[in-house]
Design a protein with these regions (language model features):
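Catalytic, metal-anchored helix/loop core of enzyme active sites in primary metabolism
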Residues: 1-292
Length: 292
């Protein structure tokens, strides 16, 4: 049982032996800076994750970061605070955990290119002319991963992959020109890193978040993880494709915002959060969602 549990609002009817309950903003901040914690896993969805990351870093805690929006909207703030407090940022996104592993857990190691992989999401095989008719239920059926509604929709439009490009720019000091995105339907290669001599290292594994989460807590050690091994003979082949810009206009928009910098990524994130909620409520169709 946890020592501390935080609720959105106070509830006198909830009690557990040995567990202290806090609530609201004060409880949220207390949990992020909990004195007994060595590492804070920030897995809050959306813009709210920025506050969690900043609270934890301000307390000198290492942050296992599963919330990419923290870097999309406040990358400079997050990284400068981490450096000031001597805290470490440990990537939890499967793609960025893969890059981190390929760089031997050194986010400042030199490289030539980062190759991020994308499954293509739930809409990858829907004819483009039929995309406006896609329902939220269809868009939530990710072919490889089980995730929350917001990120699953962002994967369907590949806005999520655009955010991951921005995340790579912050985490690894990469230029936009050093990041390549490839559609990889099998989701076995989680990302790759190319070095100056042309060598490419890839991190592979079955599509599961268990390993990235575990590794953020155990590195530099690798502990046993109850995941099935990759059956390469059964797979037979791995496939990679260029991103179809016509199918995924949100991805192109994200790259444009990454290039412009400033407040553009923050505005894009806000627009994305509002648009996805409207889509999930049935207020807009896929075409309007992709136009943000």
């Amino acid at each position: 049982r946890p020592e501390l549990a935080v609720l959105r609002s106070a509830d006198k009817n909830i009690s557990l032996p040995g567990v202290r309950f806090a609530c609201g903003e004060e409880g949220f901040e207390e949990a992020c800076a909990y004195p007994a914690a060595d590492i804070v896993l920030v897995a809050v969805s959306g813009f709210a994750g920025l506050k969690a990351a900043l609270c934890a870093l301000a307390a000198g805690k290492d942050v296992a970061l599963a919330n990419k929006e923290s870097l999309v909207v406040g990358g400079g703030l997050v990284l400068s605070l981490a450096e000031k407090k001597g805290a470490r940022i440990l990537p939890v996104d499967s793609e960025h955990s893969a890059v981190w592993q390929c760089l031997h857990f050194d986010r400042k190691a030199p490289f030539s290119r980062i190759l991020l992989t994308a499954s293509g999401g739930a809409l990858r095989d829907v004819p483009i002319e039929k995309l406006p008719c896609v329902t939220a239920k269809q868009a939530l059926c990710h072919p490889n991963w089980k995730m929350g509604a917001k990120i699953t929709i962002d994967c369907a439009t590949m806005l999520n992959k655009g955010f991951e490009v921005m995340e790579a720019m912050h985490l690894y000091g990469a230029k936009l020109s050093q990041i390549k995105v490839l559609v990889h339907r099998e989701s076995i290669v989680h990302s790759m890193v190319e070095f100056a001599d042309g060598a490419v290292l890839a991190q592979m594994g079955v599509p599961s978040m268990e390993l990235p989460i575990q590794l953020a807590f155990t590195w530099p050690e690798r502990l046993s993880c109850d995941l099935p091994p990759v059956d390469f003979a059964k797979l037979g082949a791995l496939h990679f494709e260029e991103v179809d810009k016509k199918r995924y206009p949100c991805f192109s928009l994200a790259l444009s915002c990454a290039k412009k910098g400033g407040t553009y990524p923050c505005i894009l994130n806000a627009a994305g959060e509002v648009a996805v909620q409207a889509f999930l409520r049935g207020q807009i169709n896929t075409r309007k969602l992709q136009k943000l």
